[in-house]
């Protein structure tokens, strides 16, 4: 999420690779999770040179001035269980920082992060002027030292909540010299393209795992016994309802939706009748994340036994671009 660190500090502006350079490293997946299942690609490098933001596919899965690739965990409970950050390519550790607290910048009492936006971080030199920088690492989790040689896929730390971030994720910046490189489309002179395959600097396995999701993605989905908010989802999700719970609620938290998208969530009972439905107005702008829930109070005598179903869809120009169905048996 945060801009890159140079001597573990922020660079003021994004500069993209534009000149011939030594052969770049091939980047393996830099985190020990399964993208699309227990982690998701939240943000790309901002390739727009102006005041707007745009990713390599001409989409909005980035924000102004963003200089790296953000891979987020599904919630903070996953961070607390521990997820390793991996060296993306062979190299030598040249800089690191530890000791920054794991706390959201939105949390009451969060310390200032100016000049330390990366939080706890590790910079690895891959030769030929190429570097990768891993940010927002968990305090006390760094397993390498300056001068140490590392192999691709070697654990170097764990995902944390340090620095300029609101949610647990790995921010990976790629540089050649002082210039930031988009690993999905390394040619700085190349215009964004909706047809770009995004293979870039990645190994074939990493490119497949990090494939672009134009319709966004479902980060969390489940059932609850009452209203749902982001704090409850981050903590691992609200309690699952039972037949005598105060209410039966279905919820979905999605990421990377576009302005104009219409999220729809429907809750259906065992008899096939709709219990509740939520259809949002078209989103006024692109949303990094969007939480929706729908439900109904428990009737006298409790919920009838059977299979309860939730159907979620995101409509774009009246066509579904994202869908998820999930069930609960009571």
Describe the residue ranges of each PLM region:
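Solvent-exposed serine/threonine-rich low-complexity stretches and specific carbohydrate-binding patches
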Residues: 275-286
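Beta-strand-rich binding/interaction modules
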Residues: 259-267
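A short tyrosine-centered beta-strand micro-motif
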Residues: 304-315
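Surface-exposed, glycine-biased beta-strand/turn segments
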Residues: 20-119, 152, 194-247, 251-256
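Conserved, short, structured surface segments that act as functional micro-motifs
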Residues: 71, 110-125, 137, 148-213
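Aromatic sugar-binding surface patches on proteins
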Residues: 284-298
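Short beta-strand elements
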Residues: 319-330
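Short histidine-centered loop motifs in beta-beta connectors
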Residues: 79-82, 86, 126, 130-153
């Amino acid at each position: 999420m945060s801009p890159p660190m140079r001597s573990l500090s922020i660079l003021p502006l994004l500069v993209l690779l534009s000149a011939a350079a030594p052969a770049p490293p091939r980047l393996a997946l830099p985190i020990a999770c399964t993208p699309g299942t227990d982690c998701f690609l939240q943000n790309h490098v901002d390739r727009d040179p102006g005041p707007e933001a745009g990713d390599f596919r001409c989409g909005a899965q980035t924000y102004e001035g963003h200089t790296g690739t953000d891979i987020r965990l599904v919630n903070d409970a996953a961070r607390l269980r521990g997820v390793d950050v991996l060296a993306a390519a062979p190299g030598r550790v040249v800089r690191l920082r530890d000791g920054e607290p794991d706390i959201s910048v939105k949390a009451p009492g969060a310390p200032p992060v100016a000049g330390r936006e990366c939080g706890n971080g590790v910079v690895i030199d891959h030769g030929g002027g190429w570097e990768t920088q891993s940010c927002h690492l968990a305090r006390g989790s760094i397993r390498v030292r300056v001068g140490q040689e590392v192999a691709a896929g070697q654990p170097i730390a764990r995902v944390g909540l340090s620095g300029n971030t609101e949610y647990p994720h790995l921010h990976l910046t790629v540089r050649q010299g002082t210039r930031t490189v988009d690993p999905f489309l390394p040619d700085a002179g190349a215009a964004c393209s909706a047809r770009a395959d995004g293979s870039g600097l990645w190994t074939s396995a990493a490119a497949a795992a990090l494939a672009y999701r134009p319709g966004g993605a479902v980060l969390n989905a489940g059932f609850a016994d009452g209203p749902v908010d982001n704090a409850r989802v981050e903590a691992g999700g609200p309690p699952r309802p039972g037949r005598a719970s105060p209410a039966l609620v279905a919820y979905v938290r999605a990421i990377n939706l576009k302005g104009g998208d219409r999220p729809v969530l429907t809750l259906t009972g065992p008899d096939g009748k709709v219990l509740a439905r939520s259809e949002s107005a078209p989103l006024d702008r692109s949303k990094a994340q969007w939480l929706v829930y729908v439900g109904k109070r428990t009737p006298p005598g409790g919920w009838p036994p059977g299979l309860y179903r939730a159907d979620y869809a995101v409509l774009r120009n009246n066509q579904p671009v994202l869908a998820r169905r999930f069930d609960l048996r009571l």
